[in-house]
């Protein structure tokens, strides 16, 4: 989690604007943006880690989230984020094929802490990068 903190603060990608959640206008986080972002990223990582115990659930959820974000990024002209989502999506497919016994074997595998944490971090990172205005455009 220390590495996540360093990457979030070092990259300066933060949840600065939560949008119009309650109909009162945009909610700007100001100085609370980096702590809120850190809590949100760690929460997303732990959420994906918790669902890894069910066969194929973490991989399926990750695949759906990454394909959706990739398509939306591509449509919005964000090619780097779209390709990142596509590459991670393609890497999840063989894992799912083996995990759901499509390969013909009865073996079950889990992502483990390393896999679920990386996927949770990538999904959270893409969600933040795609939901916040780019620097200099807002």
Regions found by a protein language model. Name each.
Residues 1-138:
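"…together with the soluble PPM/PP2C metallo-phosphatase catalytic core" -> "…together
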């Amino acid at each position: 989690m220390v590495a996540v903190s360093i990457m979030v603060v070092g990259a300066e990608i933060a949840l600065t604007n939560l949008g119009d959640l309650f109909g009162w206008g945009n909610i700007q986080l100001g100085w609370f943006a980096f702590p809120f972002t850190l809590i949100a990223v760690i929460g997303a990582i732990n959420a994906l880690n918790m669902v890894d115990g069910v066969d194929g659930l973490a991989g399926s959820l990750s695949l759906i989230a990454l394909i959706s974000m990739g398509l939306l990024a591509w449509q919005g002209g964000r090619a780097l984020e779209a390709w990142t989502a596509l590459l991670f999506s393609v890497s999840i497919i063989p894992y799912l094929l083996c995990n759901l016994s499509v390969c013909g074997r009865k073996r079950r595998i889990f992502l483990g802490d390393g896999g679920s944490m990386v996927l949770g971090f990538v999904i959270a990172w893409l969600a933040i990068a795609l939901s916040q205005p780019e620097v200099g455009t807002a």
